[in-house]
Design a protein with these regions (language model features):
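Extracytoplasmic Gram-positive cell-surface binding/anchoring modules and repeats
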Residues: 215-251, 332-348, 353-364
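Beta-rich interaction/scaffold domains
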Residues: 65, 70, 76-192
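Bacterial signal peptide processing site
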Residues: 20-22
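C-terminal "post-core" interaction segments
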Residues: 375-394, 406, 530-532, 539, ...
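Post-signal peptide N-terminal segment of mature Sec-exported envelope proteins
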Residues: 27-94, 99
């Protein structure tokens, strides 16, 4: 039923339903978030507080339960049936006021006093902006980095000193204001004690990794917490098939757990060489240490698809990594020893041990799922719906889960995001401040909205919000509906994309759905001396498709243009394999890791037979990601001449983060594509290709065959 709120307020006034409280209250917050209240300071207007209330703070109901309103409003507005029906005793939806409201009036001072008295603060609550009696609230916090002016509570680190925080609320009605203070004693996050357990099924959904479904996986919780923990070795054994569990060793020394493995290879003389990798988890100091981030990727099992078909790895050369110790304590993550086992939150196990192998674990409260990243990239996949379907879909998130998600984001992006330095971010806690209120207060959809904004706020085309978590129905999504939701760099990319599509439409027309018709896969020009091969994106099949075109070219062709002007990227392995058709020389690929400081150039031979042509790579402002890499490699190796306009970058490969609430975020990984220069002393300097690849010759319209012909003839003339 529609109700006119202003009229309703005039007619009914208000019902007093809050207990009288002191004007200043002191809280002591214990480790589990409970609070104790001690009264102090001044009583508010006792006459007002007692009106309509008994000693138990219950509403006093007048003896007449069918009191009628006598008001000119109903007499002068007889057609307002929605109002009349409230007081029609013959109708079932009538309201029986508990007070004779026709005689109740409140001054602004009384409204302010009542609304201040009615506030019942609990740690982590969203701070109200209005009172029942229409006073407007504004809040101030003495430590907004711990409790914000909207109530976002960022728990202290274990070992921190307790902090007294003063929250001051100012209420205003008309010209009258009043204040009330809450003194909150916030304690550091305590050590976690696991006291509950559950047995959950594990379901593998990946077709790339052969992981076995399992029953009765043990998961542990604190007494009142909702964060699931698992033993490290049990977790790794659960995903055997995605990881090679047999090569892993787990060495236990009191509070130290060492996870290690050894790989064997051969040198140029076919002599065996061994590479040793280890990670050290200190359960006393709550730290995770690794000497080389390649630890995370070399225990991976082979996928069903051969993404390196035709490539022979020859070795690499580069800069050594530096030891990285992650202070998990700073991110409120507690490593727990329990019954002789070494426990970590599932979300952190997934982040640390699986982030580099494109296989992830998803906990939804009822089951544990294993899936590959390619599944997450398909928003229409039934696997996503299956994983998100949970008995928690209609539940509300707990405070500890919200806090866990908040701290997870800081950890994940501080240590596993490849463009942190490019974004000039020192700590992601600084970046998160803007989103703290949404993530930590309000409805669950506030959190999902906050994570959505967090991802797109980075203005990184390789970082986006893929799916909401499991605390909402599976149908719930947050759509991108406007460019205003995106950052400046991303907006520029899409503006450039539309400009390229306009050129494409002018040359080839539009489809029935209004999208531009793509160029043909092969364009021949200049009396069949020039061939342009249009590559829309890179998939596993792209090298074979290009080979078929190359084999079909007439003998008159001298120059071949790889047109990646409308190519947004794809599979990096396909790019490397494609060079096998463009050069007989070794294929050179460089990358860098901005966290451990490592950088390397890798060399591959190809079993493919190269075609002897005058090669060109044509780019535009929307040539991105793996396509950007192709242009960079072609230029660095001297395989092709770059024509068109400068590419848009996209230096890092993409990977997935699964937050504790189940949200999926794609992001730029630590595998950052780079160019390398070597000085006279053999020192190697690596530079990210994130800014894009400058062209050798400018061509503004990649679909203008005459312009392409003229430019290539010009280049030929300059060479002769």
């Amino acid at each position: 039923m529609h109700r006119n709120i202003s009229v309703f307020t005039i007619l009914l006034g208000f019902l007093l339903s809050a207990c009288a409280e002191a004007n200043t209250s002191s809280f002591s917050i214990s480790s589990n978030g409970s609070s104790t209240l001690s009264e102090s300071s001044n009583d508010l207007s006792s006459s007002i507080l007692s009106s309509g209330m008994n000693e138990s703070c219950e509403t006093i109901v007048p003896s007449s339960s069918n009191a009628r309103m006598s008001t000119r409003a109903l007499e002068t507005q007889p057609n307002q049936s929605s109002l009349e029906s409230w007081f029609d005793e013959t109708k079932s939806n009538k309201i029986n006021p508990t007070i004779d409201l026709s005689t109740t009036t409140l001054t602004s001072q009384e409204r302010v006093d009542l609304d201040l008295a009615a506030i019942n603060y609990t740690l982590g609550m969203s701070l109200p902006s209005t009172g029942t009696n229409r006073s407007a609230f504004t809040w101030d916090s003495s430590h907004p980095d711990i409790i914000s002016a909207k109530g976002a509570y960022i728990n202290l680190k274990p070992g921190d000193e307790p902090v007294d925080i003063t929250l001051t609320v100012t209420a205003k009605h008309g010209s009258i204001t009043g204040t009330r203070e809450f003194v909150v004693n916030v304690q550091p996050t305590p050590e976690q004690v696991l006291s509950r357990s559950d047995l959950l099924p594990f379901v593998n959904t990946s077709e790339e990794y052969l992981v076995v479904d399992q029953e009765n996986i043990p998961v542990y919780f604190t007494d009142t917490g909702t964060i699931p923990y698992m033993d490290v070795a049990t977790f790794m054994e659960m995903v055997d098939g995605a990881v090679d569990f047999e090569i892993l060793t787990f060495t236990e020394e009191e509070d130290i757990l060492t996870v290690a493995y050894t790989l064997e290879d051969e040198d140029e003389n076919l002599e065996p060489i061994f590479y040793e990798y280890e990670a050290i988890l200190d359960f006393e100091l709550n730290t995770f240490s690794v000497e080389d981030f390649s630890f995370f990727g070399n225990y991976v099992k082979s996928t069903e698809t051969d993404f390196s078909d035709g490539l022979v790895f020859l070795g690499g050369i580069g800069n050594n990594a530096e030891l990285v110790t992650i202070p998990l304590n700073d991110y409120r993550i507690d490593l727990v020893r329990h019954n002789g086992e070494y426990m970590m939150p599932i979300s952190i196990l997934n982040l640390l041990f699986l982030n580099a192998i494109y296989y992830d674990v998803y906990y939804n409260g009822d089951k544990i799922y294993g899936f590959d990243t390619f599944t997450a990239l398909d928003s229409t996949s039934p696997v996503l719906t299956e994983m998100k379907t949970s008995s928690f879909n209609l539940e509300s998130m707990s405070l500890d889960l919200r806090q866990s998600t908040y701290h997870f984001l800081a950890l994940a992006f501080d240590y596993f995001y490849g463009l942190k330095d490019d974004k000039n971010i020192v700590s992601f806690y600084d970046y998160l401040e803007e989103y703290a209120d949404k993530i930590l207060t309000g409805l669950d959809r506030n959190l999902y909205s906050g994570l959505f904004g967090f991802a797109y706020g980075l203005d990184d085309l390789h970082t986006w919000h893929e799916a909401t978590g499991f605390y909402e129905p599976t149908s719930y999504t947050i759509p991108l509906t406007s460019l205003s939701q995106l950052g400046r760099q991303t907006q520029n990319y899409y503006q450039g994309r539309w400009a390229v599509e306009d050129l494409m439409e002018a040359a080839y027309g539009v489809n029935a759905n209004g999208s531009p018709i793509n160029p043909p896969a092969l364009r021949l020009m200049d009396d069949d001396q020039i061939a342009v091969i249009f590559i829309r994106g890179f998939t596993v099949d792209t090298p074979n498709e290009v080979k078929s075109i190359l084999c079909s070219l007439p003998e008159t062709v001298e120059s071949v243009v790889m047109d990646i002007s409308y190519n947004g990227g794809g599979n990096v392995g396909a790019v490397l394999r494609l060079f096998g058709y463009m050069t007989e020389e070794n294929i050179q690929f460089s990358s860098m890791n901005p966290v451990d400081g490592s950088a390397a150039t890798y060399f591959y031979d190809s079993t493919y037979a190269a075609f002897d042509y005058d090669w060109y790579v044509m780019t535009s402002s929307i040539t991105f990601s793996a396509a950007n890499l192709m242009a960079s490699m072609a230029k660095e190796m001297g395989v092709a001449t770059i024509i068109g306009t400068q590419s848009s970058g996209g230096a890092a490969s993409i990977g997935l983060f699964v937050t504790p609430d189940g949200t999926m975020l794609l992001r730029s990984t630590l595998n950052v594509f780079a160019n390398v220069t070597v000085d006279e002393n053999g020192n190697r300097t690596y530079t990210s290709v994130e800014p894009g690849v400058p062209v050798d010759y400018t061509l503004t319209n990649p679909f203008d065959n005459a312009a392409i012909t003229n430019l290539i003839n010009q280049i030929r003339s300059e060479r002769s």
